[in-house]
Design a protein with these regions (language model features):
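Phosphate-binding loop of NTP-binding sites
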Residues: 3-170
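Adenine nucleotide phosphate-binding catalytic loops in nucleotide-utilizing enzymes
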Residues: 127-135, 147-150, 167-227
Length: 227
């Protein structure tokens, strides 16, 4: 159904820069943060498919409550096409393990895929039969992303990183971790470090530092890009 839906709506994903998040926890929060950041840079051009809201255009009536974290295939590609027709250039979306288990996003490639974390959850008669099945379906996002960003502190990191390397070159895989984290293996580098500065009920402050050369580089020529 996913392949047919993509073809029926004339492959709308090709007209969008697609950023996808997966993880047991944090997908919705991260998606909303990303949407907000992108909207500062490119107002009224950012679509969102999240557990809470679906945004397919800049007008109030083009924002509505979601039924699923990741829509069924027909709804997904229809909403993508509508977003394109409404002038959206970027899409931030949550991708659940159920979306892969049910083949809702089969064949969809993401420009950037984020893997936040994995813990035993969503395992049962109506979800995943085993944790191995749950992890396998989570990892499919990495296999289908052009660039990958991984939380280096996640459980089962070795399996997560190995999945990313099956289809993505190392220079397109980025790792992030807290300031004090030290990886257990010496063949990887942490690209971004973050450090919490202050947190209260009103706001949180933190620093994010690019550590490696590739993390500090922009694929855009010109000194003006650094301003």
């Amino acid at each position: 159904m996913a392949i047919l839906s993509a073809a029926f709506f004339d492959y709308p994903q090709d007209d969008l820069f697609v950023i996808a998040y997966t993880g047991t926890k944090g997908k919705t929060t991260a998606s909303y943060f990303t949407e907000a950041i992108l909207n500062e840079a490119r107002p009224r051009h950012i679509a969102l498919f999240s557990t809470i809201d679906t945004v397919v255009g800049p007008e109030p009536d083009q924002r509505f409550k979601s039924n699923l974290t990741t829509p069924e295939s027909l709804d997904l590609f229809r909403d993508m096409r509508e977003a394109v027709e409404n002038g959206m250039t970027h899409l931030v979306m949550e991708v659940s393990s159920q979306a892969y288990l049910r083949n809702r996003v089969f064949g969809l490639t993401y420009d950037v895929g984020f893997f936040l974390n994995i813990t035993p959850d969503h395992i049962g008669p109506n979800e995943h039969p085993t944790f191995a099945n749950y992890l396998h379906n989570k990892l499919q996002l990495l296999v289908n992303a052009r660039k990958v960003v991984i939380n280096a502190e996640t459980e089962h990191f070795d399996q997560v990183y190995a999945a990313a390397t099956t289809t993505t070159y190392p220079e397109s895989i980025y790792l992030f971790a807290s300031a004090g984290f030290r990886p257990k293996r010496d063949d990887i580098d942490i690209d971004f470090r973050f450090d919490s500065q202050e947190a209260d009920v009103a706001e949180s402050r933190f620093t994010l530092v690019p550590v490696t050369e590739k993390a500090a580089a922009l694929n855009i020529g010109g000194h003006y890009s650094l301003a």
